């Protein structure tokens, strides 16, 4: 019992242990799974968090990047703007520096010169005497003079005090203060703004400097005057304590300051004064006269440029005499000062009406300390003769009285400002040549102290009233007339425009003064009245004229009347209308009319063309006739074009032409080249009265370009014969004349009229006409012919290129009898055109041919143009000589007709080497006859096949051999090509002539025979002889068929080194049923005709019937062939010699020697290449022409077969000798020894080299593989 108990216990324990182990394992697995799942979940969570965070980060980064880019862009743009601003500022700074430097230099120079010349100027001014002229003064003016005189007696009193005019003086004080402020401002943008800090001494120095140095400082006049004008009153007293002279100068400065206070009410007057003074200073620099005037109150109304200019001019006139007068100033009495002051004030008030404002240089002269110093103004004026000055003064006063009708001076200044000032200026300028003793009024008007202000045109603020003439000193100025003219022209322009700028840059003012300094004195007399201003003429320079004319768009016409009466030189009319350019260069033209009936731009072209009518000094009757003719033509043309888009030349058009033909010798119309939508029609016609061109485009032509040949500008003598010259008629998509009918008709009536009008047809030429409408080409060139040629293409041909070239120069010598014949031709043309629209075929009517043949005899002197028309890639090229008329109807729908057109081109050429051809024919006939004599038994075989089948088979074989050209054969052909080439022709010529031979007859000889064909014939006779022997044996047909296969297998390209590819002589006839193989290694043709298949089936059946042929049969055939060749060695050697010596001298003699010595027929490569390639390279070559064609063709068939039987015995010999252009290999023994290995080579070479025409149709695909 224990044993089982123990067993059960052990089992129990073992089970428990297993259970525990399982539990542990399960726990561990669970833990592992849970851990893996936890890790996985953590990884997933982390990855998702990472993804999200990455997305956010990327988004934030992208936004930040975009912001940064925007900021960078903004910064770059700002940087660019700042750089531009910096550049501008730098430029301005440099400009201002340069300006400042120039001004400083000028001021330094002026100061130095004034210091040098001041004493002399004072001396000149002191010598002058004061003259009184108070009889012209009104009561109001006298009051003002008295007031001003009081003011002058007190030089240091800034504010004038009078019992009568207290209020007025208060107002004047305010104005004076404003003037002082404006003068002190440094930033006034006037030309003389930088010259304000000058002292009054400098001002006086400037004045006298200009007097003495007129020509030197012409440029700096504006600056000098402005500096003088703008001197502040503080500086006037700077040098009062020095010497008597300096005291006098200080008094003058004080007087100037006081006068300026009265003169200028606003600071703007300062700049105006500078500007005006500078402008007139340069004008009137030369011929200065000293004038000393007492400065009283000057009431200046709104200043104006002209007056101020004149004022400055007069101020510049003080010379060395002024200095003398100034020296005499201290001795002047107060009375003498008062009297001229009164006179001057009268004139000054008159000048209020005229608005004459001139700056006055005041010199305060202190005679004694107790005396009331007199303010003497030294003004410069142009000195002229005294007589004219007196007249000037009288004229001035008279007009001043006129203008001073009203007492309200300011109101009158508004109304009469321009007229009065201009009148006074003009009078003064006219009378500058003479200086009168009384210069009071003139000095007041000429003083440079007057300054014009545009802001106060309505007010006459102040006047200079004190001008004292210097009786003793009269200086004449040397102004040039050109300078004065420029001054006046500038004045008038300024008066007309009424535009005045307050500020002038110093450079502008100086430049203006230079220009004004070149005007003439004569025009200075221009008055200021508007009526006079309208009458005066301005000298407009060429630049101004050029600027005026181009402003007129598309209407520019320059009329130039030439004195040459015999020649008319018309201006080039350049008209641009919507991109349409019409350029007419015409020489010796009475009239040119161009009618462009475009929908949009036609009217403008007509308007521009009509402007070319010039004055004709001689033959005005002809002109009227021409105009009448053109008007009639215009009416007829426009009417016809609107209705039917046909162009009919009526009898009315012809009559004036016939009337004017006699005169047409002298005329020459331009070549009219019109390009419509890139369609160019170029016409060059000479000695034609009128050229009318109607272009009816249904769409707006926006790119018309009419280019005129400048070659036509030639001098044409009246009585000289003009050889007409027609240049190229380039119709690049030209659209002309007709839209619907596509034709241009000349009525019978017109044809009758024109011949009568042609009195001398040798001296004129009708224009070449080119018409293309919606792709229909009408191309014709008419030379001394009355008619129109028509070409109609029913298909749209948008790229027709009709080129007529070679510039035929025709000289028709009294052939008027041709004209009626040409009329008949053109009648036929019109008929042919209508037939052409219906039938659409290329034809020449027999009647036309007859007329052409008749005209060929008469027109040996004509030379027609080569008419080359290309329509849809179809080329029709006609090289015709001595033809009166050529009519061409082109209705090409297919590209195949291009070759026919090429053939027609070459039909007129004469065949070359007819002697060689006849000689070859004799050789062929001799060879054939000898072959028949020796091979009479071959006649039985000739008649076994029907003649029809023989013809077809022969054609098939010929067509097949045409296409056989191997690439390796091409390489080897170059060695012999030179020896066989006698006549080189193009492929086109050979192809066309070959095709003609095919169509006419095969018996006809080809126009070109290469030497290879000739040699092949002599060689062919040998092989025919062999074939005859082979055929005589009854067992040969079977063996021949078999050996044919064997021989073809050995014909590799490597085995065919002696193949000549006649590159230029080889031709392929079109429209022949042929299929070229796709393989490039062999180019063979397959003729699907049933007759050829029958021949091949016969051969193949014979081959399949007896598949096993012994090599002994091959050897026997070879021996028999050799024997038959030995029978007639002389004939063949002669044939070889004759051909080699005559036609192929380059052929190696060793090859022929081997033939004569060995008397072995040609090897496989030579036989095949010479016979097949050479004999059939030329299509339909007469190599087989014998008395009986059928006999020859059968011999040819058999010859090919036997040639391969011959190869079977000899084909295994090495062929490296053949690469050296040897016809026969001398290694015959080796070939016989290697004949055993022929069968092994046949299988390997069969697929590569066996021609398809010896295989069944089912095997063709296999062979291609």
From Swiss-Prot:
<feature type="compositionally biased region" description="Basic and acidic residues">
    <location>
        <begin position="232"/>
        <end position="242"/>
    </location>
</feature>
<dbReference type="GO" id="GO:0000776">
    <property type="term" value="C:kinetochore"/>
</dbReference>
<protein>
    <recommendedName>
        <fullName>Shugoshin 2</fullName>
    </recommendedName>
</protein>
<keyword id="KW-0995">Kinetochore</keyword>
<feature type="compositionally biased region" description="Polar residues">
    <location>
        <begin position="1217"/>
        <end position="1230"/>
    </location>
</feature>
<dbReference type="GO" id="GO:0051321">
    <property type="term" value="P:meiotic cell cycle"/>
</dbReference>
<dbReference type="GO" id="GO:0005829">
    <property type="term" value="C:cytosol"/>
</dbReference>
<feature type="compositionally biased region" description="Basic residues">
    <location>
        <begin position="1073"/>
        <end position="1083"/>
    </location>
</feature>
<dbReference type="GO" id="GO:0000775">
    <property type="term" value="C:chromosome, centromeric region"/>
</dbReference>
<dbReference type="GO" id="GO:0007059">
    <property type="term" value="P:chromosome segregation"/>
</dbReference>
<comment type="function">
    <text>Cooperates with PPP2CA to protect centromeric cohesin from separase-mediated cleavage in oocytes specifically during meiosis I. Has a crucial role in protecting REC8 at centromeres from cleavage by separase. During meiosis, protects centromeric cohesion complexes until metaphase II/anaphase II transition, preventing premature release of meiosis-specific REC8 cohesin complexes from anaphase I centromeres. Is thus essential for an accurate gametogenesis. May act by targeting PPP2CA to centromeres, thus leading to cohesin dephosphorylation.</text>
</comment>
<feature type="coiled-coil region">
    <location>
        <begin position="69"/>
        <end position="116"/>
    </location>
</feature>
<feature type="region of interest" description="Disordered">
    <location>
        <begin position="1073"/>
        <end position="1093"/>
    </location>
</feature>
<comment type="similarity">
    <text>Belongs to the shugoshin family.</text>
</comment>
<feature type="region of interest" description="Disordered">
    <location>
        <begin position="1200"/>
        <end position="1265"/>
    </location>
</feature>
<dbReference type="InterPro" id="IPR038889">
    <property type="entry name" value="Shugoshin1/2"/>
</dbReference>
<keyword id="KW-0132">Cell division</keyword>
<keyword id="KW-0158">Chromosome</keyword>
<feature type="compositionally biased region" description="Polar residues">
    <location>
        <begin position="305"/>
        <end position="322"/>
    </location>
</feature>
<dbReference type="GO" id="GO:0051301">
    <property type="term" value="P:cell division"/>
</dbReference>
<keyword id="KW-0159">Chromosome partition</keyword>
<feature type="region of interest" description="Disordered">
    <location>
        <begin position="230"/>
        <end position="287"/>
    </location>
</feature>
<keyword id="KW-0131">Cell cycle</keyword>
<dbReference type="GO" id="GO:0051177">
    <property type="term" value="P:meiotic sister chromatid cohesion"/>
</dbReference>
<feature type="compositionally biased region" description="Polar residues">
    <location>
        <begin position="190"/>
        <end position="202"/>
    </location>
</feature>
<feature type="coiled-coil region">
    <location>
        <begin position="603"/>
        <end position="626"/>
    </location>
</feature>
<dbReference type="GO" id="GO:0016604">
    <property type="term" value="C:nuclear body"/>
</dbReference>
<feature type="region of interest" description="Disordered">
    <location>
        <begin position="305"/>
        <end position="339"/>
    </location>
</feature>
<feature type="region of interest" description="Disordered">
    <location>
        <begin position="499"/>
        <end position="526"/>
    </location>
</feature>
<keyword id="KW-0469">Meiosis</keyword>
<feature type="region of interest" description="Disordered">
    <location>
        <begin position="381"/>
        <end position="447"/>
    </location>
</feature>
<feature type="coiled-coil region">
    <location>
        <begin position="452"/>
        <end position="476"/>
    </location>
</feature>
<feature type="modified residue" description="Phosphoserine">
    <location>
        <position position="1144"/>
    </location>
</feature>
<feature type="compositionally biased region" description="Basic and acidic residues">
    <location>
        <begin position="1231"/>
        <end position="1243"/>
    </location>
</feature>
<feature type="compositionally biased region" description="Polar residues">
    <location>
        <begin position="503"/>
        <end position="512"/>
    </location>
</feature>
<dbReference type="GO" id="GO:0030892">
    <property type="term" value="C:mitotic cohesin complex"/>
</dbReference>
<feature type="compositionally biased region" description="Basic and acidic residues">
    <location>
        <begin position="425"/>
        <end position="446"/>
    </location>
</feature>
<comment type="subunit">
    <text>Part of an astrin (SPAG5) -kinastrin (SKAP) complex containing KNSTRN, SPAG5, PLK1, DYNLL1 and SGO2. Interacts with CDCA8. Directly interacts with PPP2CA.</text>
</comment>
<keyword id="KW-0539">Nucleus</keyword>
<keyword id="KW-0137">Centromere</keyword>
<dbReference type="GO" id="GO:0005654">
    <property type="term" value="C:nucleoplasm"/>
</dbReference>
<feature type="compositionally biased region" description="Basic and acidic residues">
    <location>
        <begin position="389"/>
        <end position="410"/>
    </location>
</feature>
